[in-house]
Amino acid sequence: MAGPTEAETGLAEPRALCAQRGHRTYARRWVFLLAISLLNCSNATLWLSFAPVADVIAEDLVLSMEQINWLSLVYLVVSTPFGVAAIWILDSVGLRAATILGAWLNFAGSVLRMVPCMVVGTQNPFAFLMGGQSLCALAQSLVIFSPAKLAALWFPEHQRATANMLATMSNPLGVLVANVLSPVLVKKGEDIPLMLGVYTIPAGVVCLLSTICLWESVPPTPPSAGAASSTSEKFLDGLKLQLMWNKAYVILAVCLGGMIGISASFSALLEQILCASGHSSGFSGLCGALFITFGILGALALGPYVDRTKHFTEATKIGLCLFSLACVPFALVSQLQGQTLALAATCSLLGLFGFSVGPVAMELAVECSFPVGEGAATGMIFVLGQAEGILIMLAMTALTVRRSEPSLSTCQQGEDPLDWTVSLLLMAGLCTFFSCILAVFFHTPYRRLQAESGEPPSTRNAVGGADSGPGVDRGGAGRAGVLGPSTATPECTARGASLEDPRGPGSPHPACHRATPRAQGPAATDAPSRPGRLAGRVQASRFIDPAGSHSSFSSPWVIT
């Protein structure tokens, strides 16, 4: 199906792609989206399958609550160091390879968790559970960064935010499934094998789907001008020259990473927090389900809205500020007994304001850091979020104290009920801090949209007016970290598609030197169709015209 023309969309296209192929979308992009969405959902169910029934698991397997917490915390621990490697795989090896590898790791981890139930007399079942969770955590590192990459490579500009939303929100959908399904499946210790088996089935299905149905990392023809230049910097170059020096990106990464860490800690500890106030594991699962459900509903409304309006910054700031406001009443109400309606309402608001802005914030990260690869731009935020999540979760559990007064606790028998008041106030304070920093200090141009529309790129970081760093030139169009205008000059247009120089046959016309550059070397014409070939370096290079001749014009935009 042919994509919209430049006249219809108002998007300026790279000269070479426009002259040779144009932009095109493929129906199989929806298969790729389905595979990544199912994989994200399955991985999330495996992550939190134990948390909603922590007391039953601990009692039947003779484990402490600290060990149960580590079955969830291991995701954060493993994802932090291996997340960097996963970003490199995603941007350098390719989206298809990363997805298939993640699917197999996810399936292997789900099977390993079942060993204590399938083999009678297994010694130390916790080791098998932890090993399986660790493999699933490795899979998460590969797939949780994929939605923004998939949206950029396979979807046109007017569908990117929606595609990113669908793939990203499949992860909290998995959390929702775990919160609802685990308490339903596990009523007593004998039900644990059933729960583990049920969660293995979707992992096997998505493994088969990814292996058979995913054929290539990138489409033969890019769907947009931004896709044609996607991942134009190598991972280490983008990290050193752009992300670390881009003040707007650093602020977004720290604040959004903190919110990710808070959400992860909230989901993992919710059952323990509410059981201390006398609420059942079933009600805790309901609150977790409301948290995710309203987040998904909010994202379904916010994704198409941002696709139309491009209000990435406004939506992110408003959503996270409202999320912080909802954290305060939850910190207070959750420690009171009998406040079921108020708890359900606050959990719903937390999901509506917090989870719903996740996909939009990931798109904002790509816009803020362009031309850095989508995997690196979003992946570093998730890695930072996992690291912050470890610290927040450890701090919240460390700040709990034993209740001295009588309580109606429904927590595991044999353990004193805990008081989570200080821990929850810490969570609310951190939410407020991160949202205020983001609202006041974060400002950025939309660099990818500027590149696609052919507008003169912004050469200065909007935060304090400081330069974005050594990776951003202070020159004119086409030299400031985004693609320059791709509209050819009248003289260039008059020469036709061959663009030959009157000074000699086969040479690009000098009037076209400002057009969007093409890739260097023989691989230029097929770079978009080869998995992993979009991972390239920002460097000086020569243009190649359709006839294959060279010009000495240098450009910072080359895909090698």
From Swiss-Prot:
Keywords assigned: Membrane, Transmembrane, Transmembrane helix, Transport
Main location: membrane
Organism placement in taxonomy: Eukaryota, Metazoa, Chordata, Craniata, Vertebrata
Topology in membrane: Multi-pass membrane protein
Keyword Plastid carried by entry: no
Superkingdom of source: Eukaryota
Protein known as: Solute carrier family 49 member A3
Ranges of biased composition (kind: Gly residues): 466-481
Family membership noted in the UniProt record: Belongs to the major facilitator superfamily.
GO cellular component term of the entry, any: membrane
InterPro entries, A to Z: FLVCR1-2_SLC49-like, MFS, MFS_trans_sf
Any one Gene Ontology molecular-function term assigned to this protein's record: transmembrane transporter activity
Sequence intervals crossing the membrane: 30-50, 70-90, 100-120, 125-145, 166-186, 192-212, 250-270, 282-302, 318-338, 341-361, 379-399, 422-442
Entry-linked PANTHER family: MAJOR FACILITATOR SUPERFAMILY PROTEIN-RELATED (PTHR10924), SOLUTE CARRIER FAMILY 49 MEMBER A3 (PTHR10924:SF6)
Pfam families, per database record: MFS_1
Subcellular location: Membrane
Region Disordered, residue ranges: 451-540
Any coiled-coil regions, as ranges: none
